[in-house]
């Protein structure tokens, strides 16, 4: 399928909107009340630091809502204002934050149900309004909605769209797209739908398995068993790993994405030599600026002396999880929570350790002077961070 031609056709449809409805001023007050925080503004102005009695809070210097998320949420609010009576759907969560999605439900925005990992569009009717979330939607979903005669409001982050353009270039040149991402993440599903031949690698370990196979060190059967659910239909590692381009899910850990890119460049250089390298490998630059800024700020924060770290964001938020990984890699007590209510008045905290289920830790905040580092994912409003800090202050006073 010519996905580029389909996008161009869709963008010219009078039932498609990706620029909003000119109602920014009308929804500004609602957005400010729901998501912004004067306390967080004051902490920023005070060098990202707050001291209250024995408690010191250190905020990362880049955290919370990124531009793409702000844009998506604002467009969703504008959509409800522009279509006050119509049924409005979202193909998934608008962003990976429970409080934001709850606010949209309160505005009578409907969410497409998912059964067994498959979205059920049977309830969507001609004339309904459907919002595509910040991390995009697959080509197949867009086709279905367009053919059904829906009004499509596309809030896809421009950085995600940039990745789609990258994999389309790979496809045009008959290159396989190596996508650094989580195979079931909505953004990676969308990106792979725009690619031709593709292979998704989760991390550097999986990338090394692919590199080894390229250099003749792997076993075909075990390779296909490992990647059977992470590749395009009909993928043949003996045929489809000769010409590679690298792209990524925009919320992955920047340093790992860069290392994976360097690994495949070295691998193709080793196999084909410097003269033919450009015929077998395409360089890339699809790392989101906002993701990079938040990760860099987190690295700076963990270089300070903090007694513990609180990382705030949805449990299905990839960029939040990677912020947590940074703290854990430095041996810092770190707690990933999705809402302020996870911090309890009895000084316990319900949190999600990396790769584990929710657990409760007692005696969360230690006695005596304590410095708490705080960051939040790109889908977390300042108002949520404020409520977390308020709970920490209350605990420190007990």
From Swiss-Prot:
Molecular-function GO terms, alphabetical: 4 iron, 4 sulfur cluster binding; 4-hydroxy-3-methylbut-2-enyl diphosphate reductase activity; metal ion binding
Cofactor(s) named in the record: [4Fe-4S] cluster
One example of a Gene Ontology biological process annotation: terpenoid biosynthetic process
Binding of [4Fe-4S] cluster, residues: 66, 157, 288
CC cofactor note: Binds 1 [4Fe-4S] cluster per subunit.
Location of the active site: 187
EC number(s) on file: 1.17.7.4
PANTHER family tied to this protein: 4-HYDROXY-3-METHYLBUT-2-ENYL DIPHOSPHATE REDUCTASE, CHLOROPLASTIC (PTHR31619:SF5)
Family stated for the protein in its record: Belongs to the IspH family.
Name listed for the protein in its UniProt record: 4-hydroxy-3-methylbut-2-enyl diphosphate reductase
Lineage: Bacteria, Bacillati, Cyanobacteriota, Cyanophyceae, Synechococcales
Gene that this sequence comes from: ispH
